[in-house]
Regions:
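Hydrophobic positions on the alpha1 helix immediately C-terminal to the Walker A/P-loop
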Residues: 108
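Conserved lysine of the Walker
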Residues: 105
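A noncatalytic interaction/capping subdomain that flanks phosphate/NTP-handling catalytic cores
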Residues: 1-101, 111-121, 129-234
């Protein structure tokens, strides 16, 4: 069975379907050792059709089941959490933009790539993982990159988190974690188990206590990039 390196963890996965194999391939490693294993139960396998998609009314796939199990294991045992966002790296630091789907996260990070050109490298356009590794938090690219399928198998320390809103005028205001706590929870996977929920809250508190957080109101002009970047770098 192949081993994949995701978020600085070696994970044993045996994907069955071609679309999942292709998605995971850039993360394959030669390691014979692994930190944990992800596998589908027989019931989960039996619920999928010949293309790896659910035969039930719930829209799931082999791909999404693996992602869910990955996020749960990293949360429970490896000091990390899934964070629905679009993240771009400039000069070795990550700038992370979170908002409900359709708000314009991908559009905004596309402007960063236009403005900074080769200095801007996409980490992940939809489903990165934030994890504490060797005493520091990093945001990691994952094989799951949303509709755009833009991202890289890289990591970077987080310079700032921005909660994005559409606006005619551009502004970036530093805010407290408490003021955006609802949005933080909406951007991650909230467990039903009380013990795991405690782990999530503790990890979020540790990460956000050490991270600058902004409310970014912006339009689709290149000036929006300057507003966001200057808020944390001036």
């Amino acid at each position: 069975m192949p081993v994949y390196r995701i978020a600085d963890l070696d994970i044993l996965i045996n994907p069955i379907y071609e679309n999942t194999i292709k998605r995971l391939f850039p993360y394959i490693t030669n390691s014979e050792n692994y930190d944990f294993e992800i596998s589908l139960t027989e019931d989960e396998k039996n619920s999928l059709d010949e293309n790896g998609f659910s035969t039930q009314t719930t829209p799931v796939s082999e791909d999404s089941i693996i992602l869910q199990k990955l996020c749960c294991t990293i949360l429970e045992s490896y000091n990390g959490f899934f964070f629905h966002s679009s993240s771009v790296m400039v000069d070795g630091n990550a700038y992370v933009f979170s908002a409900p789907s359709g708000t314009g996260k991908s559009t905004h990070t596309a402007l960063w790539r236009k403005y900074f050109s080769d200095k801007a490298v996409m980490i992940n356009d939809d489903k990165p993982i934030i994890r504490k590794h060797n005493g520091s938090f990093y945001i990691y690219g994952t094989p799951w990159m949303g509709k755009s399928n833009i991202g890289n198998n890289i990591k970077a320390p987080v310079k700032a988190i921005y909660f994005l809103e559409q606006s005619k005028e551009n502004s970036a205001t530093k805010v407290s974690t408490g003021s955006v706590f609802r949005e933080i929870l909406e951007a991650t996977v909230v467990p039903q188990n009380k013990a795991t929920m405690h782990t999530l809250l503790s990890t979020l508190d540790e990460f956000f206590s050490a991270t600058q957080v902004f409310r970014l109101k912006c339009n689709m002009d290149i000036e929006a990039v300057k507003t966001a970047y200057n808020a944390v770098n001036d």
